[in-house]
Amino acid sequence: MSNPNPATPPAPSWFAGFAAVALLGYAAFLGLNFSPFAGGSDSSGYLNAAKLLARGQLTAPPRDFAGLTVSSPTQLQPLGFIAEPARGRLVPTYPLGLPAHLALAGLLFGWTAGPLVVGVGATLAAIFLLYAIAREFRFVWPLAALGSVLFGAFPVTIFVAVQPLSDVLATTWVLAAFYAALRARASLDWAVAAGIALAVAVFVRPTNVLVLPALVVLLGAHWRSLAAFLIGGLPGALLLLAANAHLFGSPWRMGYVPVFEAFRLVYAAPTLLHFAKWLGAFAPGLVIVLAVAGFRPRSLSIRERLALALWFFVPFSVYACYEFSHEVWWGLRFILPAVPALILVALAALDHWLHSRPRLLAPAIALLLLWAVGGAVFWTRHFHTLLTKTYERAYADVGVWARTHLPADTVVTAHAESGALYYYTPFPILRWDQMSPAEFSAHAAHLARAGRPLHLVVHESEESSALNERAPARWEKVAALSQRTIWRYVGPAP
């Protein structure tokens, strides 16, 4: 097979050097602000799972609670885990794709540099792949470069790129699958690569399977291409199903909440308004207008337009019904793997409009570049995105302090800090937010009889709830740091 795409003029020789310098500068910006810490539920969940994989384990054995029995397994599970006391294990709730990347990078570069390599590397790869895809769609190099900048400057991209989260990595592997599918017109090897890339993308985020219809359309009706694509993706699909069966008891179950609970039509209306509001705010307004018009230009074939439409609208529509999509501005991260399709369609419209107006190419691109970069600066400051490292470091500081100052045989009870404490310490973790006062009193008495110290870690904002409502007792404050307080159990409440 030969690639039917007519060649576009190559970029000038100076562009490669300029792009390399720009990417290095962007990488330095992300690297300086990257948070490699196990903090809240997401970052600690991924890093805890990565540590297990690095040790050759899928699940963690229980830590020693001195024979404590509980009424609910949730009392024994740090954030990011499902506790199964009957089977003697903790099961990570997050998909294994990102933890596998983190585990490999952690073994090669250490657990501080490793997450940074994955996070920054995935972002740079996504930017490069988007440029390459735009060139495959026959856009001139300045437009392709504009598309990459639009993605890199997207405020949600920056927000997730400075944390050990799966969103950018999920997007990178989706982009790799689409690039390979476009190249598959020239070689069946690329169709196999597209299947492999999609399998990895689904390992990173299972809902990436939603881009499958778009890839099938892009590959076309050639049965050889589709068969090669299937050959590439099938081993990964079988491995994912086997992992699900081992971890969650069924090939079709995952660690997330059940699909029919998390995805409901009742969420669609508020989420669509939420998505429209923040896409309009974050993307240059002209990009949205161009994207709407971009399905008409003849610069794209009908098959290409259909593939781009499916790439964007299928994930967009499904996540519009997701319980958590409309809660915060960064809920847009759920549809980040679909955002490149929106950018590509906008580029198609711009390419069509500028075809007969070549003198306007440079001013139009300059305007959109300034708009995108200016918006990135404004929103990054507005949402204090670059303070993420400071916020997440607080969890690590508390974990390191606990490991170095608390007795080796202590049991720690915590809520928001539970995943981080599991990562940074060897202590058994109890969840005070999952207990009634009576249950806490019984657990504390059991641990006291066993001669085990008990400490409570809590954010200052939750002190009243923890100390007075959930875990009433006589407590002695032993430390205060990073807006958290650490308390030692002295005895039952008077």
Provide a role label for each language-model segment.
Residues 127, 217-220, 280-309, 313-316, ...:
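Hydrophobic, aromatic-rich transmembrane alpha-helices
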